[in-house]
């Protein structure tokens, strides 16, 4: 149990670690501030309010801290020669830092599962792109991919990119959930092949020609009105 004299920074770290594990397992909405405090060994049930302000503030702080390392690796990949003209490398810059984080230590598994819950929460999803460095890197990736997939009209491209990013996050998270429940699970592919296959699938998502049916719906004023409303 955490000591009353424990430094504030260490207490905050304990709270974030506990929150990440609980969010990964049960989802963000299902976990209370009280549960997080107890899991972190805090006797004071208002520890979240004292150190962060609210549970939402804790979620934001947790994501901001964890994404820093991901962003550093992503920037490194994007700065490699020729990446701006290589769709596979650009999609790899989305997937690879997350996959590497998962493989490096057990905390990476909890992080990617937490990230999947965050991405699925429409009200919190903007946290994924509002972090300053994240926003700049994602704009850079978007611009390069948009240029390379110029044959795909809007809003199809933006929707496909959202599906691509969500698919990568959820595929990694689902794999980690299987691992967490006991061993390797029914995995056909090793981790490296799994990630490369994700990237291959991403290329297909972004470049597959839209069908006449999709284009017809895209041209329908009724379809645009429905999309605007939700």
Show where each model-derived region lies.
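An amphipathic alpha-helix adjacent to DNA-recognition modules
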Residues: 12-17, 52-75, 79
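Hydrophobic alpha-helical connector segments
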Residues: 75-111, 161
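C-terminal peripheral helix-coil segments that are non-catalytic and often amphipathic
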Residues: 135-230
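Short hydrophobic clusters on alpha-helical segments that form packing/core surfaces
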Residues: 15-23, 202
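Helix-turn-helix
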Residues: 22, 29-57, 61
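Short alpha-helical scaffolding segments that buttress acidic/His motifs in well-ordered protein cores
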Residues: 94, 98, 112-119, 164-168, ...
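Short alpha-helix boundary/capping elements
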Residues: 44, 56, 106, 119-124, ...
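Amphipathic alpha-helical packing segments from all-alpha helical-bundle domains
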Residues: 89, 107-110, 123-149, 159
């Amino acid at each position: 149990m955490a000591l009353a004299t424990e430094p504030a920074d260490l207490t905050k770290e304990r709270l974030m670690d506990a929150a990440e594990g609980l969010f990964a397992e049960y989802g963000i909405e299902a976990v209370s501030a009280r549960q997080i405090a107890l899991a972190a060994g805090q006797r004071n049930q208002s520890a979240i309010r004292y150190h962060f302000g609210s549970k939402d503030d804790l979620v934001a702080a947790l994501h901001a801290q964890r994404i820093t390392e991901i962003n550093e690796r992503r920037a490194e990949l994007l700065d490699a020669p020729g990446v701006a003209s290589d769709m596979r490398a650009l999609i790899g810059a989305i997937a690879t830092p997350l996959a590497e984080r998962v493989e490096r230590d057990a905390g990476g598994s909890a992080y990617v599962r937490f990230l999947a819950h965050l991405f699925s929460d429409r009200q919190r999803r903007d946290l994924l792109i509002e972090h300053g460095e994240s926003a700049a890197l994602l704009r850079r990736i978007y611009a390069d991919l948009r240029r390379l997939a110029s044959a795909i009209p809007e809003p199809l491209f933006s929707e496909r990119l959202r599906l691509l990013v969500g698919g990568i996050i959820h595929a990694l998270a689902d794999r980690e959930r299987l691992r967490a429940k006991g061993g390797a699970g029914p995995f056909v592919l090793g981790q490296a092949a799994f990630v490369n296959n994700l990237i291959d699938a991403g290329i297909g998502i972004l470049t597959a020609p839209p069908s006449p049916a999709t284009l017809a719906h895209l041209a329908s004023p009724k379809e645009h009105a429905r999309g605007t409303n939700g």
